Amino acid sequence: LTAIPLDGDQPADQPAERMEDGESTPNHPWFDPVKRCCTALCSRYHCLPCC
């Protein structure tokens, strides 16, 4: 078994963004575009993934 580090440009390297509340995660007020995650109120019904 060989482990290869992920390089960040493949779909498997970036978790799918789920939009269960009908809002687009990148447009969410708590979304940090630099870190590509949310900074507050992390839950399955709000901004995902959490920082």
Curated annotation (Swiss-Prot):
The keyword Signal applies. Residues 1-4 form the signal peptide. The keyword Signal applies. Keywords: Cleavage on pair of basic residues, Disulfide bond, Secreted, Signal, Toxin. It comes from the Eukaryota. Expressed by the venom duct. GO terms for molecular function: toxin activity. Residues 1-27 are annotated as: Disordered. Belongs to the conotoxin M superfamily. The cysteine framework is III (CC-C-C-CC). This is Conotoxin Reg3b. It comes from Conus regius. The lineage of its organism: Eukaryota, Metazoa, Spiralia, Lophotrochozoa, Mollusca.
